Amino acid sequence: MAISIPGTAREAWPALPLAAWQDTCATLHLWTQIVGKVRHSQSPPLPHCWSDTLYVTARGLTTSPIPSGTRVFEIEFDFIDHRLLIHTAEGAVETFPLEPQSVASFYRRLWGSFGRLGLEIRIYGLPNEVADPIPFAQDERHASYDADYANRFWRVLLQADRLFKRFRAQYLGKSSAVHFFWGAPDLAVTRFSGRLAPVHPGGIPNLPDRVTRDAYSHEVSSCGFWPGGGAIEDPAFYSYAYPAPPGFADARVEPAAAFYSKELGEFILPYDAVRTAALPDETLVAFLQSTYEAAANLGGWDRASLDKPRP
């Protein structure tokens, strides 16, 4: 009997209309904020909030190892078996199901697990970058979890992570890892010119300006994927420069489906344009490369020393 192994292009790039899982997306966003804040509270601070992020795994999202005194633990979202797992370096494991439950319930379950593992964790208990934030411990409003769409979201992150890493490998200058920022939320990778940037004006809802100014302390060209909402209703890839050089908004970029959003101040490539393309990988990479070139060329970056020479 033949065994069917997932991995076709259609399965790799699943449909992800935000309207079909908007409540789940909002709930999962807040769950990742809680877990991300755990990493933030325990980790030595790196520039640009790099010590706060999550990372894509073959099963979901992870914090990577987190110190707690001399102990080390790790938290993982498993979007295949739909569980949250907390592993310690001593071999102990705590787990509970990812299922329809309120943010407050998720919060209580996680801290119950910490207690049984002997971990004392404190975080700032309000969400960031969301309007009208509700304290995690009191949020009974957000309580949705559609396992199918959570899995689809992760599968999209898998593909974006894979291609973002390919793109990152072509740069010799300072670059971030490919990482999941739980504030927006988005998966992102950022290249740096090496020059200081003008002080960022800040003003992001429920995010201290000092955090924003640290994130944008130096010139960047950044790209990423986010599930949609607000000015862009459905999932999309994006690319922006800070500061945006003159002419950036009018630059010609690839593919034809990409466009510049004046409201967001960045280039947008709808996810469906990639998902339905004959060559999804090439379509996304063309967007990443052409928008970077627009930022770097118009911004006068030293590409001769920053770009990896092509063989």
Task: Tell what function each PLM region has.
Residues 1-86, 93:
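An N-terminus-focused feature that recognizes amino-terminal "leader" regions
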Residues 82-95, 128-148, 235-238, 263-272:
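Glycine-rich, often proline-containing surface loops adjacent to acidic residues and nearby aromatics
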Residues 55-133:
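Long, hydrophobic/aromatic-enriched structural stretches that serve as scaffold segments
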Residues 138-226:
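Aromatic/basic-lined ligand-recognition segments
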Residues 16-19, 23, 94-102, 141-155, ...:
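Conserved aromatic-histidine-acidic binding/catalytic patches
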Residues 2, 26, 259-311:
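TerminUS-proximal long segments
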Residues 65-67, 249-254, 279-283:
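Short conserved micro-motifs at the rims of enzyme active sites and ligand-binding pockets
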Residues 213, 218-268:
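Low-complexity, glycine/alanine/valine/leucine- and proline-rich hydrophobic stretches
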